[in-house]
Amino acid sequence: MIDSRDREKILKAISRDECAELTKQLCDIASPTGAEREIGEFILDWYARHGVKPIRQEIDANRINAVGVVEGRGQGTSLQINGHVDTSFTGTEEDRLFCAELEPVSELGGAVRDGKVFGLGASNMKSGVAAFMVAGKALKRSGIELKGDCILAAVAGEISRTPIGPYQSGSYRGEGTGTRHLLTHGVQSDYAICADRSGHSIVWAQNGVAQIRISTFGNPHAAWGMTREQEPPEENNA
């Protein structure tokens, strides 16, 4: 059992600036759905350099899952912290054709200004991935021994694109592809936390998926909720 002194020891080893800089570095690496290999290799190298056991899960020629493990004694339950590294846009100059009017201050790469991190994928969800990477490093360096494994899974293919009809290329293989591959190829845990925004509260995440094709005209964009309820609602809404 980790007591308050152990907890403080770990927290003191976590730097806000390191989290921000690592988020920036992740945003500097283009990782659209279907092309997550480069960022995955970066994460695996980072794990190895900081004493976290790296596990490479091959998905296809262009994508991998990057998993790190802070190993326990094998006498307790395991916990996975999961986050995706793919983004809706490409991270190239092509994006400006679509995003210039919608988000004129957006950065293609990463930037830290006025105490904030900017860049494609910063909020969804490279900041969450950077946070658990830094936390894993701090946990490992603390020397505190866990009973069970702490698994840090940076996965491909979460963005809600699904191969339907003529849309069958790698860029449409999202909707949980990476996590499904993770679980069916040997990386499993007793419990899991998704490193997405939730206001530090327990929230409903997703209770199902409806795949509907709708054709529209105009500037492309995405629809999502930027905030979540502070407490789970009585009705199981996403």
Give residue spans per PLM region.
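Short acidic, glycine/serine/threonine-rich loops at helix termini
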Residues: 93-94, 162-167, 204-206
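Midchain, well-structured core segments that form catalytic/ion-binding scaffolds
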Residues: 173-238
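Hydrophobic/aromatic beta-strand patches that form the interior of the parallel beta-sheet core
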Residues: 55, 79-81, 153, 191-193, ...
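Acidic, glycine-rich active-site loops and adjacent beta-strand->loop/helix elements
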Residues: 85-87, 116, 153-173, 187, ...
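Active-site metal-coordination/substrate-binding segment of hydrolases
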Residues: 76-151, 160-162
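Beta-strand secondary-structure signal
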Residues: 67, 151, 211-215
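N-terminal helical capping/dimerization or prosegment-like subdomains
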Residues: 2-92, 96-98
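Glycine-rich, phosphate-binding/catalytic loops in enzymes
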Residues: 96-101, 135, 169-170, 210-212, ...
